[in-house]
Amino acid sequence: MSAGEVERLVSELSGGTGGDEEEEWLYGGPWDVHVHSDLAKDLDENEVERPEEENASANPPSGIEDETAENGVPKPKVTETEDDSDSDSDDDEDDVHVTIGDIKTGAPQYGSYGTAPVNLNIKTGGRVYGTTGTKVKGVDLDAPGSINGVPLLEVDLDSFEDKPWRKPGADLSDYFNYGFNEDTWKAYCEKQKRIRMGLEVIPVTSTTNKITAEDCTMEVTPGAEIQDGRFNLFKVQQGRTGNSEKETALPSTKAEFTSPPSLFKTGLPPSRNSTSSQSQTSTASRKANSSVGKWQDRYGRAESPDLRRLPGAIDVIGQTITISRVEGRRRANENSNIQVLSERSATEVDNNFSKPPPFFPPGAPPTHLPPPPFLPPPPTVSTAPPLIPPPGFPPPPGAPPPSLIPTIESGHSSGYDSRSARAFPYGNVAFPHLPGSAPSWPSLVDTSKQWDYYARREKDRDRERDRDRERDRDRDRERERTRERERERDHSPTPSVFNSDEERYRYREYAERGYERHRASREKEERHRERRHREKEETRHKSSRSNSRRRHESEEGDSHRRHKHKKSKRSKEGKEAGSEPAPEQESTEATPAE
């Protein structure tokens, strides 16, 4: 037993438990009490341990580590104040130590009080330490969130919004057109977004029409008239994209006479064409190569004007080979061929190919006006399908405009109105007039029908003018009638005002008299108008006669008018004089009655 404990035991036994003694016991002080050694020997071990237990219950062990000496007597090390020990006394009653954070394996566990602590681990992946067997579930902060069991990234936010078309009784067609609903509209918008971003390749649909030069060689049928190799036939195939099997398997009818391929190369890159057009051009180039061999064998020339052709090039309307008119589109028969005739001499081909003029002439002639004297007239095609009016393409730059013909076997008219036209120059190229392909212009335009149309239109205009005049007259009459009715309505009193039959009779008489007066004045105005009109007509007739006669007649007319004016004046005065005695008679009749 230490000396301090013995001293404290002595002080307790003696009853001197003062504050100074406690301070001396806590912080140390001078030894005032000398303890006899015999007293320590006589004390029982149990008596010494009892105050030790009381001290342990009063002072908590938090922050205090007991170190046992060799003899087994504990040596306390006080590291906290009394206030902290009092506040932690409640926690000591709970046999649970809560540790926040990672606890490494092998860390010293608090095994005091005989129970194992429970570890509340908040971090993911950590193990819950303890031997209690109940696994404590923690909050996983790193896991992705979820709404009603659905991951947060997969939740459709539109489902939380109150859409107007989802309300009961709403008509979906008021919000989505063309048969869309909410889901298909979202899919459509997503597809358009991908197309705009360039993530999706737009396929060439089968509804787009194309006109391709299917056969690159120019052909002439045996029945056509050949003048020193100047008639060349393009074979143009009209159909739809996407049917490469049909187009490649289409047999081409070869004629006896073949010509070099088309004049110009197109600048279309092969990436812009579909696979069907590429396969088509490959077959066309094969045919061109075979026909070139025949052309060289027949004419003995080593090189034709242009035998070079780009591998992916295709002749399409609107590029270099332009056709003046294509009468309609055939959709029923996709493999129908339209044969286009163009004239070209071999010398013109050699001279003109070296430097072709620009693509469009600056003043391309309009197709709806009659042609100038240096252009061939537009052709007539009787066998073309009348589905769509012709689009009207400008003529090609390096050659005279080709013309469509109904049948190749039909004869050609000689000349343009039986006259020869001079060649019209453009740049360095002179286009000669076509002698055989153009029918005469008067045969194409029926002038009598046009004049009939103009005469008919003039008659219709006159008729409409007359109708408008009659309508105006009827309107004026209706206005006068309505005015008269309003006037009568203004003068007419209500039926309750009529007290006697005399008043009603008098009112009717007054109304009739007013109507008669109005009618007389209107007739007078009409007579005056007619007289003025007649005088105008007379003066117009008089102006055509001689001056002396006109003067004489005008004097007679003036005297006649003066005489008439005097006469009318006299008649008016007589009427006024006759109407004045009437009130006097009424007054004289009224006096005897009184």
UniProtKB/Swiss-Prot annotation:
Bias type Basic and acidic residues, positions: 1-10, 33-43, 295-306, 454-492, 501-528
Residue numbers spanned by region Disordered: 1-96, 238-306, 358-594
Keyword hit for Ligase: no
Cellular-component GO terms for this entry: cytosol; mRNA cleavage and polyadenylation specificity factor complex; nucleoplasm
Keyword Cell wall biogenesis/degradation (UniProt): no
Extent of Low complexity compositional bias: 274-285
Compositional bias per record (Acidic residues), positions renumbered to this chain: 44-55, 81-95
GO BP field: mRNA processing
Modification type Phosphothreonine: residues: T494
Region feature (Sufficient for interaction with CPSF4): 137-243
Location(s), subcellular: Nucleus
Region (Arg/Asp/Glu-rich domain), start-end ranges: 457-490
Biased composition regions of type Basic residues, renumbered to the chain: 542-551, 560-570
Ranges for region Sufficient for interaction with PAPOLA: 1-111
InterPro entries referenced in this protein's UniProt entry, alphabetically: Fip1_dom, Pre-mRNA_3'-end_processing_reg
GO molecular function: RNA binding
Modified residues (Phosphotyrosine): Y426
Sites bearing Phosphoserine, chain numbering: S85, S87, S89, S304, S492, S496, S500, S554
Region (Sufficient for interaction with CPSF1 and CSTF3) residue spans: 443-594
Keywords, in A-Z order: mRNA processing, Nucleus, Phosphoprotein, RNA-binding
Top-level taxon of the source organism: Eukaryota
Quaternary structure note: Component of the cleavage and polyadenylation specificity factor (CPSF) complex, composed of CPSF1, CPSF2, CPSF3, CPSF4 and FIP1L1. Found in a complex with CPSF1, FIP1L1 and PAPOLA. Interacts with CPSF1, CPSF4, CSTF2 and CSTF3. Interacts with AHCYL1 (when phosphorylated); the interaction is direct and associates AHCYL1 with the CPSF complex and RNA. Interacts with NUDT21/CPSF5; this interaction occurs in a RNA sequence-specific manner.
PANTHER family assigned: FIP1-LIKE 1 PROTEIN, PRE-MRNA 3'-END-PROCESSING FACTOR FIP1
Function: Component of the cleavage and polyadenylation specificity factor (CPSF) complex that plays a key role in pre-mRNA 3'-end formation, recognizing the AAUAAA signal sequence and interacting with poly(A) polymerase and other factors to bring about cleavage and poly(A) addition. FIP1L1 contributes to poly(A) site recognition and stimulates poly(A) addition. Binds to U-rich RNA sequence elements surrounding the poly(A) site. May act to tether poly(A) polymerase to the CPSF complex.
The family this protein is said to belong to: Belongs to the FIP1 family.
Protein's UniProt name: Pre-mRNA 3'-end-processing factor FIP1
Lineage: Eukaryota, Metazoa, Chordata, Craniata, Vertebrata
